[in-house]
């Protein structure tokens, strides 16, 4: 569980400390890469809460998602079609699905802990 959080903290820190500007022709690639990274991070948190987290799956999924997203955007540029929008849609849907599962999981655990406290008292 510490690997996703460490990556997020390091990424935010490096992004805030550097004055790096991205050219506009790379904005589609960057948006997909950020969404792919967030999807992988949220998926890792979901897997941890469900007890199925595996670092190898997390790291390989991270790189596979980024490579797939960038390849899709690259192909779309050469075909003259905005294929990056398909990646944005897919990662966005998965992101919200994972967040919904995390929310349900946390609410279930919270409700069970409240019931257990009432039964003890």
UniProtKB/Swiss-Prot annotation:
The chain crosses the membrane at residues 2-22, 29-49, 57-77. InterPro entries: DUF1290 (IPR009709). Keywords: Cell membrane, Membrane, Transmembrane, Transmembrane helix. The keyword Transmembrane applies. It is found in: Cell membrane. It is a multi-pass membrane protein. GO terms for cellular component: plasma membrane. Belongs to the sbp family. This is Small basic protein. It comes from Bacillus subtilis (strain 168). The lineage of its organism: Bacteria, Bacillati, Bacillota, Bacilli, Bacillales.
